[in-house]
C-alpha cells in the first residue's frame, strides 16, 4: 500500500515541513489535516495519500496509518539570470521525490 510521485518542482525542505506533521497519523486524520493546511504542496500530498489508500485492497479507514513518508532530493535544474555588464547569476530549481507507505 504505497504510492510515489516524482519530479515535483518544489524543494525537499519545504515538502518535509508538511510531511513531518502527518507521519504516524491515521488515514482519516491525515486527510483532514492536509485539507486545511496552507502551502501549495499540501494538496499534492493529499492526492498522494488518497492514491496510496486506493492501492490498498482489503483495508478500511480504521486500520490504516501512515507508516512512512519519504522525501528524497531529485535532480537540480540550473538556470541563469542575466545581470549587468554581461554577467549571469545561477538559479537552482530543486525537485523532490515523495513516497507514502500506509500500513
Curated annotation (Swiss-Prot):
InterPro entries: Ribosomal_uL22, Ribosomal_uL22_bac/chlpt-type, Ribosomal_uL22_bac/org-type, Ribosomal_uL22_CS, Ribosomal_uL22_sf. GO terms for cellular component: chloroplast; large ribosomal subunit. GO terms for biological process: translation. GO terms for molecular function: rRNA binding; structural constituent of ribosome. It is found in: Plastid, Chloroplast. Signal peptide: none annotated. CDD domains: Ribosomal_L22. Part of the 50S ribosomal subunit. Belongs to the universal ribosomal protein uL22 family. This protein binds specifically to 23S rRNA. This is Large ribosomal subunit protein uL22c.
